[in-house]
Amino acid sequence: MASTGEIWLQWFSCCFQQQRSPSRRPHQRLRIDRSMIGNPTNFVHTGHIGSADVELSANRLNAISTQMQSKGGYETNSIHSLHAC
């Protein structure tokens, strides 16, 4: 059974990236401003996840994940070392 954290990682893998080289200072963050953010491309609304959905059973979360993956655009990858961007 997948933990809630693993489910969030699967759904929002776009928000995580592999950890950079250790030479980078750990508390240094990339500053993002409006000029770095463009309009969405190939956007397809596949579902809505609300804050109360984290209280759902693992079976229901897996069903939602499967439904979203069936819509396309979701790839499963094995990511070992992550940090939030």
UniProtKB/Swiss-Prot annotation:
Keywords, sorted A to Z: Cell membrane, Cell shape, Cytoplasm, Cytoskeleton, Lipoprotein, Membrane, Palmitate, Phosphoprotein
Domain CRIB: 37-50
Compartment(s): Cytoplasm, Cytoskeleton; Cell membrane
Cellular-component GO terms for this entry: cytoplasm; cytoskeleton; plasma membrane
UniProt membrane topology term: Lipid-anchor
Covalently lipidated residues, kind S-palmitoyl cysteine: C14, C15
Record function comment: Probably involved in the organization of the actin cytoskeleton by acting downstream of CDC42, inducing actin filament assembly.
Family: Belongs to the CDC42SE/SPEC family.
Protein name: CDC42 small effector protein homolog
Source species of the chain: Drosophila melanogaster (Fruit fly)
Lineage of origin: Eukaryota, Metazoa, Ecdysozoa, Arthropoda, Hexapoda
The encoding gene: Spec2
